[in-house]
Curated annotation (Swiss-Prot):
Ubiquitous. The gene is C1qbp. The modification Phosphoserine is found at residues 198, 202. It holds the Pfam family MAM33. Residues 74-91 are annotated as: C1q binding. Residues 1-71 form a transit peptide. Disulfide bonds: none annotated. This is Complement component 1 Q subcomponent-binding protein, mitochondrial. It comes from Rattus norvegicus.
Length: 279
């Protein structure tokens, strides 16, 4: 309520005070109700399905299958399959990359489901960057401006960008230890790539792990950069940049991750459609 009162111009003075006194305050329960969270993926066709004449059929109890296959067939499943068919068609229409984009800098790409690994060898060192696209799309901001009534539905939908955390491993030839740097994209830096001398990613943690170990040990010392001296932090960022992990790399990784996430999302919709449709 206070932010609304601060918006009243001082010039209104006592008139605004009288107006506030004449209007009853809303119940506290309404003020404490959480604001609705926006859907990350705008299912535009869902509202059409929900308001259709077939809605009443979805509430009917399932009837035995007439074909004798023993499977469950409902009007809800039929409507679900039709919705998924339309949704898959729309997602493929807006898909930017039919194949995954390539990274510059001689990086080799290995993909295993939602996990991707980039490998590069430079002067006796092996650099590995690993990331996972699950839960990599940040939530939309509530403060974004609402589209005007004249805008099309396609223009109203925000473009989804995948910004996953990624881990950089640097291993020396014949070395027993691997330097591990845990990196992420700060939310306040997303969308400000063009600002001079601004890093669009940051180092969160640094540690040493035994080369060849499949699992990292929690007993190894881990350096958190939140309380780190800025001079040491800058040297760590320069260390990564000298090995090809810089702002250009981070930009291309976002593009690669976004394409992979969208590809996996479409595959998930297709699998979901096949699962619901199967007899």
């Amino acid at each position: 309520m206070l932010p609304l009162l601060r918006c009243v111009p001082r010039a209104l003075g006592a008139a605004a005070t009288g107006l506030r006194a004449s209007i009853p305050a809303p119940p506290l329960r309404h003020l404490l109700q959480p604001a609705p969270r926006p859907c990350l993926r705008p299912f535009g066709l869902l509202s059409v399905r929900a308001g259709s004449a077939r809605r009443s059929g979805l509430l009917q109890p399932p009837v035995p299958c007439a074909c004798g296959c023993g499977a469950l067939h409902t009007e809800g499943d039929k409507a679900f399959v039709e919705f998924l068919t339309d949704e898959i068609k729309e997602e493929k229409k807006i898909q930017k990359h039919k194949s995954l984009p390539k990274m510059s800098g001689d990086w080799e790409l290995e993909v295993n489901g939602t996990e991707a690994k980039l490998l590069r060898k430079v002067a006796g060192e092996k650099i590995t960057v690993t990331f996972n696209i699950n839960n990599s799309i940040p939530p939309t901001f509530d403060g974004e401006e609402e589209p005007s009534q004249g805008q099309k539905a396609e223009e109203q939908e925000p473009e989804l960008t995948s910004t996953p955390n990624f881990v950089v491993e640097v291993t020396k030839t014949d070395g027993k230890k691997t330097l591990v740097l845990d990196c992420h994209y700060p939310e306040d830096e997303i969308g400000h790539e063009d600002e001079a001398e601004s890093d669009i990613f940051s180092i969160k943690e640094v540690s040493f792990q035994t080369t060849g170990d499949s699992e990292w040990r929690d007993t190894n010392y881990t350096l958190n950069t939140d309380s780190l001296d800025w001079a040491l932090y800058d040297h760590l960022m320069d260390f990564l940049a000298d090995r090809g992990v810089d702002n250009t790399f981070a930009d291309e990784l976002v593009e690669l991750s976004t394409a992979l996430e969208h590809q996996e999302y479409i595959t998930f919709l297709e699998d979901l459609k096949s699962f619901v449709k199967s007899q």
